[in-house]
């Protein structure tokens, strides 16, 4: 999303035309963000403001992946969630018993992201883990871009909990395999039918490489063309493009036979 479809609160040129092209061609695609901060509905409304009309089901967050993981592994568990009220409500609405800092015990600590996280949240998370809770992290992004450079993100919060407790988190989000399997099931596709589009080599393109799918890099976000051409980054992606129009033209020429499904992938950025 951010860096691929829009830059914070501004649409990226050709994004709406590219999505319209995919829709007219009958292509299946989803948007995935590593940030658990906003709900699919909030992101759908944001996209609609950029003339991009998609359903909530086409937008997936790392928070949803965390919920799916627990539904598959321990759907009757109690959880302590570090994150926004929206994320806590999502867990509660999915049937989990979400506890606050006053409870005596939790089965899992879910480390998400919120700009209002404070010491008491981290202290409570550590206490639950010392008492036997397992740690899950929605995404390991230690920092994300913002208007003033960088700002800490989920990975930084998680690192403090890991350091204090010695407990290693179960890593979800990109570039993990569980997230890939979740997206693959959502699209009901084989690996050879999938490709990922993103703007960051160390997360988006690595996601494709580790999970064995084609990866297309666009130079509209984090990674510049010069960085992409650096020899150290060779082998991390299949092709690079200046913008989505160039990718669209490439797709028109390439796809005379079976056409791939797309996963639009992006590192989260600070919301303005």
Describe each model-derived feature in a short phrase.
Residues 3:
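Receiver (REC) domain active-site loop signature in two-component systems and cognate sites
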């Amino acid at each position: 999303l951010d860096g691929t479809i829009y830059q914070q609160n501004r649409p990226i040129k050709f994004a709406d035309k590219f999505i319209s092209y995919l829709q007219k061609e009958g292509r299946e695609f989803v948007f995935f963000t590593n940030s658990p901060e906003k709900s699919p509905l909030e992101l759908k409304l944001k996209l609609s403001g950029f003339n991009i009309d998609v359903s909530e089901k086409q937008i997936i967050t790392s928070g949803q992946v965390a919920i799916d993981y627990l539904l598959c592994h321990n759907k009757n568990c109690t959880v302590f969630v570090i994150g926004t009220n929206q994320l806590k409500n999502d867990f509660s609405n999915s049937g989990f018993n979400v506890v606050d800092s006053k409870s005596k015990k939790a089965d899992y600590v879910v480390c998400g992201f919120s700009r209002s996280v404070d010491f008491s949240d981290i202290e409570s998370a550590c206490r639950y883990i010392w008492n036997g809770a397992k740690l899950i992290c929605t995404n390991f992004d230690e920092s994300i871009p913002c208007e003033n450079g960088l700002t800490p993100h989920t990975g930084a919060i998680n690192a403090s909990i890991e350091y204090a407790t010695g407990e290693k988190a179960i890593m979800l989000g990109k570039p993990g395999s569980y997230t890939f399997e979740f997206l693959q099931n959502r699209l009901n596709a084989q690996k050879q039918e999938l490709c990922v589009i993103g703007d960051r080599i160390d997360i988006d393109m690595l996601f494709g490489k580790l999970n064995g799918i084609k990866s297309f890099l666009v130079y509209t976000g984090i990674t510049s063309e010069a960085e992409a051409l650096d020899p150290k980054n060779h082998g991390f992606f299949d092709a690079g493009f200046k913008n989505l129009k160039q990718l669209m033209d490439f797709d028109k020429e390439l796809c005379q036979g079976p056409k791939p499904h797309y996963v639009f992938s992006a590192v989260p950025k600070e919301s303005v």
